[in-house]
Design a protein with these regions (language model features):
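Phosphate-binding loop of NTP-binding sites
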Residues: 1-211, 215-217, 268, 272-274
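ATP-dependent carboxylate-amine ligase
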Residues: 1-72, 203, 272-279, 283-305, ...
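Acidic-glycine-rich active-site phosphate/pyrophosphate-binding loop
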Residues: 104-108, 232-248
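Glycine/Thr-rich phosphate-binding loops of Rossmann-like dinucleotide-binding domains
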Residues: 158, 182-183, 217, 230, ...
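A conserved, hydrophobic alpha-helical segment in the catalytic core
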Residues: 166-179, 214-217, 251-290, 318, ...
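Short, polar loop motifs at secondary-structure junctions
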Residues: 209-215, 226, 364-368, 410
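Beta-strand->loop->alpha-helix junctions that form or flank phosphate-binding loops
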Residues: 211, 217-235, 253-258, 282-287, ...
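Short glycine/threonine-rich catalytic loop with a Thr-x-Gly-x-Asp
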Residues: 235, 255-266, 292-294, 313, ...
Length: 413
């Protein structure tokens, strides 16, 4: 009776999600093996007069063992095929980017600038694992690519080194490093050492490293932001100056957030290193598109919506709060707080929200107690069912309001 009960519970849970579960090929293979092993076990059990419930979990255990072995064999083959295809591309230059936060933004911004001069390709969406990169190289990397921009993420030490050894990037970018994913690495030192694995690339010629990373001075390493000066930052964009080759250069981009000036400093330095002129870079930044769900400004129904739902770090969320504070009208925020962080960070965030927002909608129950204790009670509304978010916003907001979606989380959080 265990498996019918488990399956029913799974289907009920999946139906309640605002984003239903997608079954990948790997999951389908796993389920196929599980069903096969289960039927074999049932047949053996029914044919035996002395059957017991002692082996009730045997199908799961056997399926896991068989599936793990199969997937490892498949992956070794896929990886070898991807390496051959990757090495067959003549004169390819690869830029690999890692950071605790901001790596996807840097990748997207760099792609927008470089594509104006070179045949450029980037890993899609937030793909940043060795498995995702191998799949991308095998299926989608064009053979006429001149510059390949890849994002490198990690859950354990060694993940980024594996990516570095596979891609062997000539240019390595290490962005801001902080306590994001501290639950995986336990200490900030472990996070820093893991990010620095990118510099082990056998073919690295140049590295651009954020000043938050404690690294010695090397001829091949440039630390950034170098004499960055933010002139102005508001809901219309950012204006900033950067020192390049001993000269102060002026830049403007129609995206939001002081931290994006830091991300763009890395983009400017890499683009200039790869042969683009300052004028070409300045022109490209003028048309820089907003990154979806990362301080994306949308105007609809007489309201200003700031979609920052993919931003889950303290610095980024504080910056979103700071930008919204420049708005003179009524301000509303929808957030679950910080999901992968400390109580201290959530308390700091809650206090800043309390100072700058008129109404706070808390989604989920993860940080409800912390936020309710640090935000004026009359401002707080706890939304337990996210499917009611649209009707709640229609009821609690009006024309002229600014609405910030900050680190929105799925129901199961």
């Amino acid at each position: 009776y265990f498996y019918p009960l488990y399956l029913s519970s799974f289907l009920f849970w999946n139906k309640k999600l605002d984003r239903p579960l997608v079954l990948t090929s790997r999951v389908k293979r796993f389920l196929g093996i599980l069903i096969g092993v289960t039927f074999i076990m049932i047949a053996l059990t029914l044919s035996s007069k002395n059957s017991t419930n002692i082996f009730i979990f045997a199908p799961l255990i056997l399926t896991y063992a068989i599936s793990t072995a199969m997937e490892k064999i498949f992956f070794i083959s896929f990886k070898h095929k991807a390496k051959q295809r990757y090495q067959s591309i003549n004169n390819l230059k690869t830029v690999a980017i890692t950071a605790s936060f901001g790596k996807t933004s840097i990748k997207n911004y760099l792609y927008h600038v470089l594509k104006n001069k070179y045949k450029t390709y980037k890993t899609p969406r937030s793909v940043n694992t060795i498995a995702g990169i191998v799949l991308d190289v095998n299926k989608d990397l064009p053979l006429d690519t001149q510059i390949y921009i890849a994002e490198a993420g990690a859950r354990v030490q060694g993940d980024i080194e594996e990516i570095a050894m596979f891609l062997e990037p000539e240019i390595c970018v290490i962005g801001s490093v902080g306590e994001q994913h501290i639950e995986y690495f336990k200490t900030l030192d472990n996070i820093i050492h893991t990010k620095m694995e990118l510099l082990k690339s056998p073919k690295m010629k140049k590295g651009f490293v954020h000043e938050s990373v404690p690294i010695k001075d090397y001829p091949t390493i440039t630390k950034y932001p170098n004499n960055l000066h933010i002139v102005k930052s508001n809901l219309d964009g950012i204006w900033f100056d950067v020192e390049i080759d001993g000269k102060i250069e002026h830049f403007h981009a129609p995206i939001l957030g002081n931290f994006n000036a830091i991300n763009l400093t890395a983009v400017i330095l890499v683009s200039h290193y790869l042969g683009m002129s300052i004028e070409e870079i300045q022109k490209a930044l003028q048309t820089l598109p907003q990154v979806e769900h990362r301080l994306q400004k949308i105007e609809a129904g007489g309201k200003i919506i700031i979609d920052d739902s993919f931003n889950g770090n303290l610095e980024g969320m504080l910056e979103a709060v700071n930008i919204c504070s420049t708005y003179t009208g009524r301000k509303v925020i929808i957030t679950p707080g910080l999901v992968e962080s400390t109580d201290e960070a959530n308390i700091l965030l809650a206090k800043q929200i309390n100072e700058n927002f008129d109404f706070v909608i808390l989604t989920g129950s993860l940080n409800t107690h912390l936020f309710s204790s640090n935000i004026d009670k009359e401002k707080v509304y706890i939304l337990k069912d996210k499917s009611l978010m649209e009707t709640t916003l229609a009821r609690t907001t009006k024309v002229g309001d600014l609405i910030l979606f900050a680190n929105d989380a799925p129901n199961f959080i």
